[in-house]
């Protein structure tokens, strides 16, 4: 009886989603021109070919704290950290695991965590699991961030007065430590725009806040040899922690949290998404190593990708009333308001052989539904022109 009741409940919620045009479903791969994947540099196919020459066990057989750790992984972590100008790093099984592990265990009770309103769902989930007091600031709005930081200082002062009085009355020492954290993405996954990173770093220093930057969509695209936006701006020593993921431009799977040795040791001890999971298999780590070999190669270049991004933007501005979100990243978004309308336009593009997907509410705010178009090194100008031939009709 209870099983039937829960099934009825699930069905009612799903039906409600369908009626609101919010229902999600899985699709298999297709032979359309790829404007959808995060494989910006086409590494997934290159690495696939390289890894065919290696033979590894099918699984790690345990967590990194038990049977799943190897010198190969630790050497790889240090190699990646050196490449990005960090002291060290810790590999997680996915970008989601990395953000959840980092943000859930670092900010503590009475700490303040301030996040951009458009951070990735994994950062939101990690923040929700922390004991910190959480605030959002308006997307990429420096004034809004400073307002939150200044109010955080006022809140801290009030708490300190209360705790000082309490500890004085109880004749105990004051041991509470207050920290402020800012969590952002360097390139935002649903808009493709870049964080105002230099200004945010300046504010973090002014207010003594620890900055956490997710570089998922900047790695491989910005900075020398794809080191990321933090490195491009020379801010490596100004950021408390960086999350670099391997599942986007690197064409692999997994992620690494970059920072100090103390941060790494702390995560090994307290990040539950690291501690309580089987380590990724060795062939996953080998593919990551191969990706970094490609990045470090003297032949590496992402100039064609940036040319195609520029070409796309040039074509977009020629269509009157086309609302393009400002972005110089590989993620280009065209606003098509309304879930049904956005899906309809995406279907027209797919019917002409172009794999372009609609991003609809609630993933993005209502009225800001969009076509999310990803540029790749392997795309062509002719393929881009086909997009705008459809949009002009």
Residue ranges and their predicted role:
Residues 46-47, 82, 351-352, 363-393:
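PLP-dependent enzyme catalytic core of the Aspartate aminotransferase-like
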Residues 249-314, 321-325:
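PLP-dependent aminotransferase class I/II
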Residues 135, 139-213:
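Active-site phosphate-binding strand-loop segment of PLP-dependent enzymes
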Residues 225, 231-266:
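Active-site PLP attachment segment
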Residues 102-121:
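Conserved PLP-anchoring active-site segment centered on the Schiff-base-forming lysine
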Residues 2-59, 209:
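N-terminal "arm"/small-domain region of PLP-dependent enzymes with the aminotransferase-like
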Residues 42, 304-310, 319-353, 363, ...:
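Conserved PLP-binding catalytic core of the aspartate aminotransferase-like
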Residues 57-95, 117:
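Conserved N-terminal alpha-helix of the aminotransferase class I/II PLP-enzyme fold
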């Amino acid at each position: 009886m209870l099983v039937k009741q829960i099934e009825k409940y699930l069905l009612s919620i799903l039906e409600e989603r369908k009626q609101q045009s919010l229902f999600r479903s899985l699709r298999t791969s297709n032979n359309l021109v790829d404007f959808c994947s995060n494989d910006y540099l086409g590494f997934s196919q290159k690495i696939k070919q390289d890894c065919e020459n290696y033979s590894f066990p099918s699984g790690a057989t345990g967590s990194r704290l038990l049977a799943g750790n190897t010198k190969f992984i630790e050497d790889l972590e240090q190699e990646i950290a050196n490449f990005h100008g960090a002291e060290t790093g810790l590999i997680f099984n996915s970008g989601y695991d990395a953000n959840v592990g980092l943000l859930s265990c670092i900010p503590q009770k009475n700490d303040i965590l301030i996040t951009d309103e458009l951070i990735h769902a994994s950062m939101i989930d990690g923040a929700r699991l922390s004991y910190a007091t959480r605030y959002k600031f308006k997307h990429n709005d420096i004034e809004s961030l400073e307002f939150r930081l200044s109010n955080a200082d006022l809140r801290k002062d009030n708490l300190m007065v209360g705790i000082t009085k309490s500890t004085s009355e109880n004749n105990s020492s004051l041991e509470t430590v207050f920290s402020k954290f800012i969590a952002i993405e360097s390139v935002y996954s649903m808009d493709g725009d870049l964080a105002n990173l230099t200004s945010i770093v300046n504010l973090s220093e002014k207010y003594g806040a620890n900055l956490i930057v997710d570089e998922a969509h900047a790695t491989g695209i910005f900075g020398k040899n794809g080191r990321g936006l933090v490195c491009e701006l020379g801010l490596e020593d100004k950021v408390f922690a960086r999350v670099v993921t391997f599942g986007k431009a690197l064409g692999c799977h997994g992620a690494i949290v970059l920072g100090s040795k103390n941060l790494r040791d702390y995560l090994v001890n307290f990040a539950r998404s690291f501690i309580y999971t089987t380590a990724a298999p060795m062939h996953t780590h080998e593919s990551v190593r191969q990706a970094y070999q490609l990045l470090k190669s003297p032949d590496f270049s992402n100039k064609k990708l940036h040319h195609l991004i520029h070409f796309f933007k040039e074509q977009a501005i020629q269509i009157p009333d086309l609302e393009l979100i400002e972005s110089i990243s590989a993620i280009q978004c065209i606003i098509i308001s309304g879930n049904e309308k956005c899906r309809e336009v995406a279907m027209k593009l797919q019917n002409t052989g172009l794999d372009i997907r609609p991003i609809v509410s609630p993933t993005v705010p209502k009225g800001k539904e969009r076509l999310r178009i990803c540029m790749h090194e392997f795309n062509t100008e002719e393929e881009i022109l086909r997009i705008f031939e459809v949009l002009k009709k």
